[in-house]
Curated annotation (Swiss-Prot):
Residues with Leucine amide modification: 62
Source species of the chain: Eumenes pomiformis
Consequence when changing residue 50 to K: In amidated EpVp2a-D2K2; no change or increase in activity against bacteria, and no change or decrease in activity against fungi. No change in lethality when tested on water flies and lady beetles. Decrease in hemolytic activity
Annotated function: Antimicrobial peptide. Shows activities against Gram-positive bacteria (S.aureus MIC=50 uM and 200 ug/ml, and B.subtilis MIC=200 ug/ml), Gram-negative bacterium E.coli (MIC=100 uM and 200 ug/ml) and fungi (B.cinerea MIC=5 uM, S.cerevisiae MIC=128 ug/ml, S.pombe MIC=128 ug/ml, A.nidulans MIC=128 ug/ml, and C.albicans MIC=64-100 uM). Shows cytolytic activity against insect cell lines. Its hemolytic activity is controversial, as Baek and colleagues report no activity while Bea and colleagues note a hemolytic activity.
Name this polypeptide is given: Venom peptide 2a
């Protein structure tokens, strides 16, 4: 079993070195939305999770 584990470890190490030495793409495709402030998500609600309100509700329920 030690031999199999060593072989798998060696394969992972070799693949890691190959991946680390791979050249990046010359001109990668731009992100779909590079500036999140330019086109905010219309479904995002900053008030959806009110932590302070939740703490106050729990404190009032316990006390």
């Amino acid at each position: 079993m030690r031999g199999t584990s060593f072989i798998l470890f060696a394969v992972v190490v070799i693949l890691g070195f190959l991946n680390a030495n791979a050249e990046p793409l010359a001109n990668p495709a731009p992100l779909a939305n590079p500036d999140p402030l330019a086109n905010p998500d219309p479904l995002a609600n900053p008030e959806a999770f009110d932590l302070l309100g939740l703490v106050k509700k729990v404190a009032s329920a316990l006390g």
